[in-house]
């Protein structure tokens, strides 16, 4: 495993992951309109899942001897629920790419396989959230 490259990739993913936590929380608490109220609770659940994954990234960065970033990817907010979904979809795409990129430096030893497997689970969970957002977007 290229530890320095791994830490760098994980920190980039963490910056985006932290943004995801906050953006889902913002959408959850701010959506208006009857047609969006059903999504508010789901967005809160997504925020909680994003926080759990952010913690896992911090744990892995620390275990590898790195320091977790305190930087946060550019955060956005809009009171327009449809535009908020669009923004989440775009930003989650960026985060998915960063998580995928973090797999590259993992290598083939047991510890690195565990990192790769964890990242794949995060990608799968996040992609399911994006699928939900896309379905919600099409229904609005």
Model-derived regions: residue spans:
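Iron-associated oxidoreductase/ferritin-like identity signal
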Residues: 1-140
């Amino acid at each position: 495993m290229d530890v320095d490259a791994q830490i760098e990739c994980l920190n980039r993913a963490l910056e985006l992951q932290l943004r995801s936590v906050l953006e889902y929380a913002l959408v959850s608490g701010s959506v208006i309109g009857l047609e969006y109220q059903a999504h508010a609770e789901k967005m809160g659940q997504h925020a909680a899942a994003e926080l759990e994954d952010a913690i896992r990234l911090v744990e892995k960065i620390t275990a590898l001897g790195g320091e977790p970033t305190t930087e946060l990817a550019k955060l956005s907010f809009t009171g327009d629920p449809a535009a908020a979904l669009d923004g989440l979809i775009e930003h989650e795409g960026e985060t998915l790419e960063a998580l995928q990129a973090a797999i590259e430096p993992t290598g083939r030893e047991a510890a690195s396989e565990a990192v790769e497997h964890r990242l794949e689970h995060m990608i799968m969970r996040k992609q399911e959230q994006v699928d939900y957002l896309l379905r919600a977007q099409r229904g609005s």
